[in-house]
């Protein structure tokens, strides 16, 4: 009788041990899965955070803007827009070749991409902007000859938009009093916005006269 009791106790002990080992293995596997998941989530969060930082910091600032007057008969418009840009504070490098400009006026909405029209002296030639889907740029200051990439705070470039071609046929540019909104977006998604209002009066201005915007 007592021998049977001892055998039963031994079987129960072995069974309990097997169950315990199985529980330990399951817990270890679960812990490994949790660690891997946590690592993946952390890496994903870091990537998303870096992308958000890039969108905020990797962009240009518009230092100033001016236009050129187009005089056709008695009509005067602004047919070219010039923007002096530099890197925003804390920004990484920005390639103008990979930059887009969203152009929005009272009559036109377009997304402009970069068109290399510079001459041998890195001066932009707006006359070569023959389609309404492009902007161009020239170098103003570039200490390491990296243009069309802005990679130092001292770098300056001049972005040029030919509003006559952007606004389309039968126009000579943007009319007096008209507002143009420009969203300049780098490859990383960082955006600088500038809103320009054309002067109310251009009387007395001749063809190609500069005008502050």
Curated annotation (Swiss-Prot):
GO terms for molecular function: structural molecule activity. It comes from the Archaea. The keyword Aminoacyl-tRNA synthetase does not apply. Residues 1-10 form a propeptide. Disruption phenotype: Cells are non-motile. Cells lacking both flgA1 and flgA2 show defects in motility, whitout affecting surface adhesion ability. It comes from Haloferax volcanii (strain ATCC 29605 / DSM 3757 / JCM 8879 / NBRC 14742 / NCIMB 2012 / VKM B-1768 / DS2). Keywords: Archaeal flagellum, Glycoprotein. The lineage of its organism: Archaea, Methanobacteriati, Methanobacteriota, Stenosarchaea group, Halobacteria. InterPro entries: Flagellin/pilin_N_arc, Flagellin_arc. The keyword tRNA-binding does not apply. GO terms for biological process: archaeal or bacterial-type flagellum-dependent cell motility. Major flagellin required for motility. Not involved in PibD-dependent surface adhesion. Much more abundant in cells compared to FlgA2. It is found in: Archaeal flagellum. Its main location: other. Belongs to the archaeal flagellin family. This is Flagellin A1.
């Amino acid at each position: 009788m007592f021998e049977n009791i001892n055998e039963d106790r031994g079987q129960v002990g072995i069974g309990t041990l097997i169950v315990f080992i199985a529980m330990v293995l399951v817990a270890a596997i679960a812990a490994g899965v949790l660690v891997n998941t946590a690592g993946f989530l952390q890496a994903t969060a870091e990537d998303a955070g870096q992308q958000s930082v890039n969108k905020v910091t990797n962009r240009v600032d518009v230092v100033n803007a001016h236009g050129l007057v187009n005089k056709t008969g008695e009509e005067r418009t602004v047919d070219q827009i010039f923007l002096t840009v530099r890197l925003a504070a804390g920004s990484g490098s920005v390639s103008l070749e990979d930059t887009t400009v969203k152009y929005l006026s009272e009559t036109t909405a377009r997304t402009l991409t970069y068109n290399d029209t510079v001459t041998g002296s890195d001066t932009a030639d707006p006359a070569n902007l023959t389609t309404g889907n492009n902007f161009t740029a020239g170098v103003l200051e570039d200490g390491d000859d990296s243009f069309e990439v802005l990679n130092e705070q001292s770098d300056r470039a001049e972005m040029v938009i030919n509003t006559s071609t952007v606004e389309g046929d039968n126009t000579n540019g943007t009319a007096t009093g008209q507002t143009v909104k420009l969203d300049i977006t780098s490859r990383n998604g960082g955006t600088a916005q500038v809103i320009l209002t054309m002067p109310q009066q251009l009387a007395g201005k001749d063809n190609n006269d500069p005008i502050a915007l």
